[in-house]
Amino acid sequence: MFLKSLHLRHFRNYSEQSVTFAAPKTILVGDNAQGKSNLLEAVEWLATLQSHRTHRDRDLIQQGHESAQIEATLERQGVPLDLAVSLRPSSGRVLRVNGCTVKRTADFLGQLNAVEFSCLDLELVRGTPAIRRNWLDRILLQLEPLYSQLLQTYQKALRQRNALLKQAGSQGWDEALWQAWNQQLVINGTRIIRRRQRLIERLAPLAQDWHRVLSGDRETLTLSYESHVPLGDGTSEAIVAAFSEALATRRAIEFLQKTSLVGPHRDDVGFCLNAQSARQFASQGQQRTLVLALKLAELALVESVVGDTPLLLLDDVLAELDLQRQGILLEVMGDRYQTLMTTTHLAPFAAPWRQQAQILKVTAGTIASVSDTAAQTSD
Ligand SMILES: Nc1ncnc2c1ncn2[C@@H]1O[C@H](COP(=O)(O)OP(=O)(O)OP(=O)(O)O)[C@@H](O)[C@H]1O
């Protein structure tokens, strides 16, 4: 898969900007707060219809404007493909594939695949469970576009159920409606749990292998999906039964706390190094190694499932890695994956590597092509 060009209009700090990608590797260099991450965010948005930096479309639109557009031309297995999105909070999103408007997000997702690795991902180990759930969900959205509908249906059931819990204790309690939302929560929640659990099972051996390489065979990484619902033998029937039972058991406490306490919206992912919780014991260096192993696993999994090489988006991460890990990452990338990476300095990139890359200078929402020497001089 190759992203040939990108056009941004009123997206973040870009007023109107076209970029043509001319090499498998593109380095976006510039000072802080110039728009480097914003450009990667636009590509991430085309891949997942989400940003890991914000949940609100409004934030993506340039201040003082009503709408933003992202347009991309790519080549997928030799076939050209045009993608376009228009974000307008007042009237919603418009998604187009090859000039035709698509109604379902599932028809847009999966057209462009990308694996993003940013310094925010370093939070995957120590951050909140929501960060790890979002990570799984973003991968699933690319592997299985219909997952977006499943998430939406689940979130709707959760919102309705929480609204009912807020009314609990008042007159006119509607038990039938409560049971109906419980059923929706259990059916869709079970589907989500099973998909996430299967994803972990597929990522685990890949991440384990990478981790072994990165840690010089010193540590063994294990991944587990930590659900509030006992998974039993992992079948739908077993999870549905356990989920229903957990809801019945926790009914009193949910009524007291007025919120839903059981379901995939509360689940987590566990990482262990040599059987010890990475969240509690991993050093900064071990966390970086672990996250790099996860990202390399993600890259391999997306590639094997979609049958094409995803784009790799590296947002300011090379500086976070030591020379050995940088070397491994750059070697894996080779020319196999089209890679867009941001940096404030070109120094960490070896000279031969820089010479092969397209270097773009980002300054206050404008992008200019520069030679290696020119970028170095102004660096
Ligand atoms: N909706 C918006 N409208 C206008 N400007 C915005 C909007 N959202 C973000 N910005 C601006 O974009 C800039 C941040 O860009 P970005 O996050 O891409 O930085 P960066 O170049 O990657 O820098 P760093 O190296 O610090 O990560 C800031 O100046 C911010 O004010």
Swiss-Prot record:
Pfam families xref list: SMC_N
Localization, UniProt: Cytoplasm
SUPFAM superfamilies per the UniProt record, alphabetical: P-loop containing nucleoside triphosphate hydrolases
Main location: cytoplasm
Cellular compartments per GO CC: cytoplasm
Binding residues annotated for ATP, in chain numbering: G30, D31, N32, A33, Q34, G35, K36, S37
Entry superkingdom: Bacteria
Signal peptide: none
Alphabetically ordered keywords of this record: ATP-binding, Cytoplasm, DNA damage, DNA repair, DNA replication, DNA-binding, Nucleotide-binding, SOS response
Swiss-Prot/TrEMBL GO biological process terms: DNA replication; DNA synthesis involved in DNA repair; double-strand break repair; SOS response
CDD domains referenced in this protein's UniProt entry, alphabetically: ABC_RecF
InterPro entries named in the record: DNA-binding_RecF, DNA-binding_RecF_CS, P-loop_NTPase, RecF/RecN/SMC_N, RecF_2
Molecular function GO terms recorded: ATP binding; single-stranded DNA binding
Function: The RecF protein is involved in DNA metabolism; it is required for DNA replication and normal SOS inducibility. RecF binds preferentially to single-stranded, linear DNA. It also seems to bind ATP.
PANTHER family, alphabetized: DNA REPLICATION AND REPAIR PROTEIN RECF
Sequence similarity: Belongs to the RecF family.
Listed name of the protein: DNA replication and repair protein RecF
Organism encoding this protein: Thermosynechococcus vestitus (strain NIES-2133 / IAM M-273 / BP-1)
